[in-house]
């Protein structure tokens, strides 16, 4: 270990299975790029650890070998490469890549093969990620740089806290962020020995989950702290059904769980600079928003009408996103002095049914199947009100985009939607926090009630402008999220002797 000397900067090793733009299957890839950048902007020394998939190795401009690992018989030989993740011309993040051709050098996806099946050796593939994450976060690290915090993400790095727990030497404090509890990394019990975990780890008070080894349960059980992507989701996962069998353990650890809302990229999502808008605007010149409404109506083939509210949604068309409720509500909305613009793709039957509604109400309902980046920006800017009827939503992004664009949303009161959208009430209007509308029952009638509340508010021009400005003035930046994580890191360091003070 390096010799100790005073140091203020917190060192964070961010262990992740994916990071944009090198490799991405979902929102975790975006978070893995954005959060470390925001942490570094707060003067923290955040670095990434990532498996060396072909796309990752191909995307590295330069690399150098900094360590070798002989972890046989549990894992094939591996080397550690040092590089940088280039975010833009002026911003990059230090990156460690695990080069292990036997586990990562193959065609197909990150988690799935070419037929859409899980790779049969995923336990070993992400066991190695977890193991090297733990080694780098302890006094067994071959590197001079040793973190104070190892920040794990979802099941793929869930064994890192377990390996650290059974390491007798100095080690970093561990945090695991739960982005999606539905994916748990459950494997047959014989993987315990294969992965080099002690027998005692495989118990109810450990990584055992209904007879299987659960990477995610291991992370939840052994980590020093747990975070989720919103305070609401942090509460919901401690009970059925969103605990997915882990609600009992999560409830026992409730004092160690913190919900922190993800940020949005305000460089990309900014109505003052957005290149996809026909007219840019800020909270001070909201009248310019009307030009985008007209452009959206023309683009989608809707009647040009500024007098009635135009509702919009950009979504995967799935049961989880409440698209079936949207299907029920759309014709009811068409009977009102209102319009709907929808962009999305997903369930084939829902796609067909929504497209049929657009044909039945051509001046009132417009549907585009697929995804269109430019149109998604124009919908956020050109609609008057955004709709998000998700059954559950750990965090959600579109409701933050829409508020940032002065488009108050109607949302189901769940997870991150409940945390980021403040329901309009006399009290929230008075304290200038109101920014949208909640509905509480997952039914068409309850959703429609929220829409009607929005329509009534829309026709009160002064009230509506207040709602718009309240939403636009909220801080949805990654800096706010990074500051919250900084507070957790500091508390964990007080409880835990840092692995390095050099």
Swiss-Prot record:
Pathway: Glycan biosynthesis; glycogen biosynthesis. It comes from the Bacteria. GO terms for molecular function: alpha-1,4-glucan glucosyltransferase (ADP-glucose donor) activity; alpha-1,4-glucan glucosyltransferase (UDP-glucose donor) activity. Signal peptide: none annotated. Its EC number is 2.4.1.21. InterPro entries: Glyco_trans_1 (IPR001296), GS/SS (IPR011835), Starch_synth_cat_dom (IPR013534). ADP-alpha-D-glucose binds at residue 24. It holds the Pfam family Glycos_transf_1. The keyword Membrane does not apply. GO terms for biological process: glycogen biosynthetic process. Keywords: Glycogen biosynthesis, Glycosyltransferase, Transferase. Gene3D superfamilies: Glycogen Phosphorylase B. It catalyses: [(1->4)-alpha-D-glucosyl](n) + ADP-alpha-D-glucose = [(1->4)-alpha-D-glucosyl](n+1) + ADP + H(+). It is an enzyme of class 2 (transferase). Synthesizes alpha-1,4-glucan chains using ADP-glucose. Belongs to the glycosyltransferase 1 family. Bacterial/plant glycogen synthase subfamily. HAMAP family: Glycogen_synth (MF_00484). This is Glycogen synthase. It comes from Nitrosomonas eutropha (strain DSM 101675 / C91 / Nm57).
């Amino acid at each position: 270990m390096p010799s100790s000397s005073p140091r203020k900067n917190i060192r964070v090793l961010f262990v992740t299975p994916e990071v944009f733009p090198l490799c991405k299957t979902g929102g975790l890839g975006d978070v893995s790029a954005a959060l470390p950048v925001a942490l570094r902007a707060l003067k923290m020394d955040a670095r990434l650890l990532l498996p060396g998939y072909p796309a990752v190795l191909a995307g590295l401009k330069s690399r150098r070998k900094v360590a070798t690992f002989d972890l046989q018989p549990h894992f094939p030989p591996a080397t550690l490469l040092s590089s940088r993740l280039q975010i833009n011309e002026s911003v990059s993040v230090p990156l460690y890549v695990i080069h292990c051709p036997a586990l990562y050098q193959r065609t197909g996806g990150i988690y799935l093969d070419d037929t859409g099946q899980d790779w049969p050796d995923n336990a070993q593939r992400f066991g190695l990620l977890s193991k090297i994450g733990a080694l780098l976060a302890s006094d067994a690290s071959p590197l001079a740089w040793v973190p104070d915090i190892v920040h794990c993400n979802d099941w793929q790095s869930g064994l890192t806290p377990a390996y650290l727990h059974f390491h007798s030497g100095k080690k970093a404090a561990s945090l695991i962020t739960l982005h999606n509890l539905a994916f748990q990394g459950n494997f047959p019990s014989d993987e315990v020995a294969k992965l080099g975990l002690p027998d005692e780890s495989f118990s109810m008070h450990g990584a055992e989950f209904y007879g299987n080894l659960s990477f995610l349960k291991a992370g939840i059980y052994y980590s020093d702290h747990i975070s989720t992507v919103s305070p609401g989701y942090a509460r919901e996962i401690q009970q059925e059904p969103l605990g997915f069998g882990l609600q009992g353990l999560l409830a026992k650890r409730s004092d160690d769980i913190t919900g922190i809302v993800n940020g949005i990229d305000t460089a990309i999502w900014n109505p003052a600079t957005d290149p996809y808008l026909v007219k840019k605007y800020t909270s001070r010149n909201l009248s310019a928003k009307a030009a985008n409404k007209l452009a959206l109506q023309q683009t989608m083939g809707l009647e040009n009408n500024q007098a009635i509210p135009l509702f919009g949604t950009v979504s995967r068309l799935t049961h989880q996103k409440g698209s079936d409720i949207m299907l029920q509500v759309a014709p009811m909305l068409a009977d009102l002095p209102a319009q709907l613009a929808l962009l999305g793709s997903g369930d084939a039957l829902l796609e067909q049914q929504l497209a049929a509604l657009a044909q039945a109400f051509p001046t009132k309902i417009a549907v585009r199947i697929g995804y269109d980046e430019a149109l998604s920006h124009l919908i956020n800017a050109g609609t008057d009100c955004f709709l998000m009827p998700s059954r559950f939503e750990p965090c959600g992004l579109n409701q933050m985009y829409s508020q940032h664009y002065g488009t108050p949303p109607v949302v189901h009161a769940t997870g991150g939607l409940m945390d980021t959208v403040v329901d309009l009430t006399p009290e929230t209007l008075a304290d200038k926090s109101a920014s949208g509308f909640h509905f509480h029952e997952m039914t068409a009638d309850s959703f429609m009630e929220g829409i009607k509340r929005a329509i009534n508010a829309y026709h009160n021009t002064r009230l509506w402008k207040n709602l718009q400005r309240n939403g636009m003035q909220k801080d949805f930046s990654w800096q706010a999220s990074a500051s919250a994580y900084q507070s957790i890191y500091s508390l964990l360091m007080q409880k835990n002797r840092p692995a390095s003070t050099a």
